[in-house]
Regions:
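PP2C/PPM-type serine/threonine phosphatase catalytic domain
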Residues: 1-109
Length: 109
């Protein structure tokens, strides 16, 4: 399977989006790869207007990249960690990101 991903900041000063493809996190540019077997793709879109959207998106993708098949409890745990991180620094107050993703296990598909 061929995988293509593109993300760029556009007119904004910073790109708050992150794309996770297996263990690669893309923050700007074009990515192309081929994959046979397990596939994990996640898109974290930092919430504009909130503080530290890019930090939130990176944090979520970094935490997801080492989990083979992501489950509900993994997402709950990462959300709790993100909420805790938002209290560490006044610049992180209210940081948020959205998350969409898919995991494919070739042996089960």
């Amino acid at each position: 399977m061929k995988i293509y991903a593109i993300t760029k900041k556009g007119e904004h000063s910073e790109n708050e989006d992150r794309i996770l493809i297996n263990d690669t996190i893309l923050s700007d540019g074009i990515f192309e790869t081929e994959c046979n077997g397990e596939l994990k793709i996640c898109i974290a879109d930092g919430v504009g207007g909130n503080n530290a959207g890019a930090t939130a998106s990176s944090f979520v993708c970094e935490n997801l990249k080492n989990i083979a098949l992501i489950g509900k409890n993994d997402l709950i745990d990462i959300n709790s960690k993100l909420l805790a991180k938002s209290t560490e620094n006044v610049n992180y107050n209210g940081m948020a990101t959205t998350l969409s993703g898919i995991c494919i296990d070739d042996e089960k598909s």
